[in-house]
Design a protein with these regions (language model features):
Chain A
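ABC-family P-loop ATPase nucleotide-binding domain
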Residues: 1-18, 231-248
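ABC family nucleotide-binding domain
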Residues: 7-215, 221-226
Length: 248, 181, 623
């Protein structure tokens, strides 16, 4: 981390991604302006096909925009080449996917240390860091197991640990609870809350209202564009009883 | 608060009022936070009048449990009628009715009269529900795993989620109606 | 009946759904069966025309000859040959006929010839069979068929023998002498060749001999002339040799008969030299037998490669097949039906391939076995025996069945639900490889892990390259020896053997190349998801494509090393004669060449895979 850290972890201006052309032109992401402050948790909601996953891939450097700018931690990334984007994914971004995308033939700890190895860290350091991260997400006792032996919630915890491997500026999560039951979802939400408290910047794309409701900021997306933005903070406290039908 | 809840809590053993309150607090967690201290006693008094509960004076008052309220010294016991009432209550299948018709009619009326944009109403409602969801979800996240209250909170969360999904359906429907009209 | 139809229809559907794979499979098996057919056809060819010629010409069991003593200059004496005709066991004989050296000139070409003086009347033993024109008459000669073919001489032509012009009455074949240019020398020949120099009396010479004082011939052709005209055409009419053809009551005892009467060393030069007919057969069929060994070995090597190819192809589509099996079973197919469908597909391919191989091999055989007109029936097409057809078909079917049996059984045994749910074969975990790879550079890390996910495919890769390189090294060694032989001794048949080697080598390499591409492609498809994740985690496309490529190169390197050890062993096994091992730098060059070739072959699929956009793959696999 540099000394002069920009206030924003992520900023996009007029970010656009189109597919096809002419009659069949599809605007997957349409002129999106997004600013995410450091330490902020932003949820992007919308029906499937609204372009929220594409947005995530664009800001994470998995895909290149058709036009518009992306600033990641104060650095323009929208015109970077494949190689530079790969390096960026290695150092500045951590991904968490709906399908976990863990490698089934690698043990939990081997999965978590993979990004560090790809980034060229020594095997010893990568292993130590992976163990620390597994400890942090609470699955250190499963370090030697294969992912298939883990529950969905545990797998997603491992995936989060992997995303944190190289201390990214930004963690990007794509439907992180999409494959999880209610209890496991709660588990992941708690983990995100811990990350949030430790100052990690998070952008989560989801159609799970529970994640959306717990974010600092909720953005609603339709047809590739932002249509609504809400901060849900503010007191409604003491109404839980009413919500449960337990009127006093 | 329903009388049957207090009755049922007495079914296990005769209890003091403060014991009942503590049991309620434990089961409800943050949901029961707004519960008034005297509320249990109000209900108990009503139950006593109805002959479902009687009180006993302790023969050997426990000096360790010095209550502030004189009523607290009493132990409440179920009467046979009270026990019967509990048994009946347990077999009942009543369920809180969600009043969706009201909101639905609100949208229809607003649209018909041109008084307000149904989508605006939906949006406002959605934010309100999200705020509620946020509160419930945060409370749920704060509960330790396996607590009684966590289960209750999960119920709240899931119902709010269902409501939000319905609002989404409302939004979709009213958007297409607007664009086709 | 209905079930059979169902199986056939399902199998046909699936084959049509993936025509490229079916074609590759066909190609792999057809290449192997073609080579095998060639090898088997050659087996029948060797010896057969000679036998026919022997019968047609009353071929001799013993060819006995005496020549002028090259060291003393003493003239040859035909008397011992006449004595031989009366020896025990001899049932018939002809000769002795005089033999003289000469030079033929025709159409501007000159060549050495041996002239054998014969009469117009047919001899009891060795009456050359005329294939063109007529037998001897006054003032006309007859030319041996292979020699005539080589010089382009036909009946009715005019040739010059030692300056004398003479007409060619006809062209004939004989079983008493190996066809040109491997002719036995009845007169003095130079240089003395080890392999067929026995034809002259001076062959088994001692250490301290004086230089031959008589002019000698080089690779002479054979011309029959009227006995009384012989001296007119001879270069040195004084230096005559004599030859006698004998038949024995037991032709199999010819070798023993010869051994008992053979000249034993210095001082024995005046004794006749005896050549048993088996020796001539040996000479005649030498090249064919070598070609046959090469073809059979090549056929087996190609067969092994075909198995590897089929296994990779089949394994690569296992994931897809498993789902299909699930579907089949879900709608009520029994495991037997499922296995039958899977097997049917490959059996159909194998049958077509073996048919193609039989036809291809049968058509290609004459090109390799054609020995011009050296012997009667030599130019006739070699025949396919029922046994050969059966063998080739059985091998092709074996390849298909072997390569599909395990997957078919496994697929059929998989539980229906698991088969429906399972989208892919789960990768295997090779713990030590994962641990080792984490200590290596990123590219190697990716390569070893990719290879480790499918250890059996990696082993097949090793096996495939081992087989190819073994074949390649053996072929190179054989080629080198052949070149050396050809340099000393040009022979169209040996050149053709060289062509056979080249064809087999090229087929072997081509099949191995196909294997490599197929294997790379299967790997690329297989690790598509893992590749996408790896790239999402920060591997560059260059690292990934290098890794995918290396995942093939590493087993190929292992295979090349094994093959360069196995190659000489294979060559040793195929060629029973003294083997000149190829020099070490050859093997190093072959290994390096294989590594480069595999890198190049895998480059395109690996690059394509590594540059594919990542996002859609990660999206598509959310389920």
């Amino acid at each position: 981390m540099t000394t002069a850290e920009p206030r924003l972890a992520l900023a996009t201006r007029g970010l656009t991604k189109t597919y096809g052309d002419g009659e069949s032109l599809v605007r997957a992401v349409d002129a999106v302006d997004l600013e995410v402050a450091r330490g902020e948790t932003v949820a992007v909601m919308g029906p499937s096909g609204c372009g929220k996953s594409t947005l995530l891939h664009l800001v994470g450097g998995l895909d290149r925009p058709s036009s518009g700018e992306i600033d990641l931690a104060g650095r323009r990334i929208d015109r970077l080449g494949e190689r530079a984007l790969a390096r960026l994914r290695r150092t500045d971004v951590g991904f968490v996917f709906q399908a976990f995308h863990l490698m089934d033939e690698l043990t939990v700890v081997e999965n978590v240390e993979l990004p560090a190895l790809l980034a060229g860290h020594s095997p010893r350091r990568a292993r130590a860091r992976a163990m620390a991260l597994l400890d942090r997400v609470g699955v250190e006792h499963k370090a030697g197991s294969l992912p298939t032996a883990l529950s969905g919630g545990q797998r997603q915890r491992v995936a989060v640990a992997r995303a944190l491997s190289n201390e990214p500026v930004l963690v990007l999560a794509d439907e992180p609870t999409g494959n999880l039951d209610s209890a496991a979802t709660l588990d992941v939400l708690r983990l995100f809350e811990e990350l949030h408290e430790s100052g990690q910047t998070l952008v989560i794309v989801t159609h799970d209202e529970r994640i959306a409701a717990t974010a600092d900021r909720l953005i609603t997306m339709r047809d590739g564009a932002f249509v609504d933005e809400t901060r849900l903070t503010g007191g409604t406290s003491g109404r839980l009883g009413a919500l449960a039908g337990f009127e006093s | 608060m329903q009388q049957e809840v207090v009755l049922a809590l007495l079914a296990k053993e005769p209890s003091h009022g403060y014991q009942l309150r503590a049991r309620l607090r434990q089961a409800l967690g943050p949901v029961g936070e707004a519960m008034n201290a005297g509320q249990v006693y109000v209900v108990l008094t009503r139950l006593e009048k109805a002959g479902l509960v009687t009180t006993e004076r302790p023969e050997r008052p426990n000096p360790a449990k010095t209550a502030k309220d004189p009523a607290d010294r009493k132990t409440y016991v179920l009467t046979p009628q009270g026990q019967q009432r509990v048994a009946e209550w347990l077999t009942e299948v009543s369920w809180p009715k969600p009043d969706l018709a009201e909101f639905h009619l609100k949208l229809v009326a607003a649209a018909a009269a041109g008084l307000a944009d149904p989508l605006g109403i939906v949006d406002t409602q959605r934010r309100e529900l999200l705020r509620r969801l946020r509160e419930a979800q945060r409370a749920a996240m704060a509960e330790p795993d396996g607590s009684d209250a966590a289960l209750l909170l999960e119920g709240i969360v899931l119902r709010l989620q269902a409501d939000l999904r319905w609002l989404e359906a409302c939004e979709r429907s009213w958007t297409t109606r607007r664009s086709t009209s | 009946m209905g079930r059979l139809l169902l199986v056939a229809r399902l199998a046909a559907r699936d084959l049509r759904r993936r025509p490229a794979e079916a074609a590759l499979l066909l190609l792999a098996i057809a290449a192997a069966t073609t080579t095998l057919t060639l090898g088997l056809v050659m087996h029948g060819v060797a010896g057969d025309p000679y036998q026919r010629t022997r019968e047609a010409t009353s071929g001799p069991d013993i060819v006995a000859s005496v020549a002028l003593n090259p060291f003393t200059g003493a003239a040859a004496d035909p008397a011992p040959l006449e004595d031989l005709a009366g020896a025990d066991g001899v049932t018939a004989g002809s000769g002795p006929f005089p033999v003289a050296g000469s030079e033929i000139e025709v159409g501007g070409q000159t060549a050495d010839v041996q002239l054998i003086g014969r009469s117009v009347e047919p001899a009891d033993v060795d009456q050359p069979a005329v294939t063109d024109g007529d037998w001897l008459r006054d003032g006309a000669v007859v030319v041996e068929a292979a020699f005539a073919g080589a010089l382009g001489i036909e009946a009715g032509d005019t040739v010059t023998l030692d300056g004398e012009t003479v007409e060619v009455a006809g062209v004939a074949v004989t079983a008493a002498m190996t066809p040109y240019p491997w002719s036995n020398c009845l007169v003095l020949c130079a240089p003395f060749r080890d392999d067929d120099g026995e034809g002259e009396g001076a062959a088994g010479g001692g250490p301290a001999r004086p230089e031959p004082q008589v002019e000698s011939l080089t690779d002479p052709g054979l011309v029959w002339v009227m006995e009384d005209e012989l001296t007119a055409f001879a270069s040195s009419p004084d230096a005559l040799s004599y030859v006698t053809y004998l038949q024995l009551d037991d032709p199999d005892s010819a070798q023993a008969f010869a051994d008992a009467r053979q000249p034993q060393g210095p001082g024995d030069e005046d004794k006749p030299f005896l050549e048993p007919w088996q020796h001539i057969v040996e000479q005649v069929t030498h090249v064919e037998r070598n070609a046959q060994r090469v073809l059979l070995t090549g056929g087996w090597l190609l067969g092994i490669l075909a198995v590897a190819s089929v296994a990779v192809l089949v394994g690569g589509r296992m994931a897809d097949q498993t789902r299909r099996v699930g579907l089949l079973k879900a709608v009520g197919g029994t495991p037997a039906l499922v296995a039958a469908v899977l097997l049917a597909e490959y059996v159909v391919v194998a049958l077509v391939a073996s048919a193609a191989g039989l036809v291809g091999g049968r058509l290609a055989a004459p090109a390799i076995t054609d020995r011009a007109a050296g012997l009667l029936g030599g130019a006739a097409a070699p025949s396919l025996t029922a046994g050969a057809v059966l063998t080739v078909t059985a091998v092709a079917l074996g390849v298909a069945v072997l390569a599909t049996f395990v997957p078919a059984i496994r697929a059929a045994r998989t539980s229906t639900v698991a088969a429906l749910n399972e989208s892919a074969r789960p990768p295997r975990r090779v713990g030590w490889l994962v641990a080792l790879s984490s200590r290596l550079p990123v590219v190697l890390l990716i390569a070893l892990r990719v290879a480790g996910r499918r250890p059996r495919r990696a082993l097949l890769g090793v096996a495939s390259v081992t087989v190819t390189v073994s074949g390649l090294v053996a072929a190179l060694a054989a080629h080198a020896e052949l070149d050396a032989q050809l340099a000393a001794n040009p022979d169209p048949r040996m050149e053709r053997l060289g062509d056979v080697l080249v064809v087999i080598t090229v087929t072997l390499v081509a099949l191995a190349a196909v294997n490599t591409v197929v294997s790379t492609w299967a790997t690329v498809l297989d690790v598509r998801h893992a590749s996408a994740v790896t790239r999402a985690l920060g591997a560059t496309p260059a690292q990934l494509s290098a890794g995918l490529s290396l995942a093939q190169v590493v087993p190929a390197f292992a295979g090349a090393v094994l093959g360069s050890i196995g190659g000489p062993l294979l060559y040793d096994a195929v060629d029973q004669e003294d083997v000149v091992m190829p020099p070490g730098w050859w093997l190093v060059a072959v290994v390096a060449g294989v590594v480069v070739a595999v890198s190049v072959l895998t480059l395109v699929p690996a690059r394509l895979a590594a540059r594919r956009p990542v996002a859609p793959i990660l999206q598509a696999e959310t389920a």
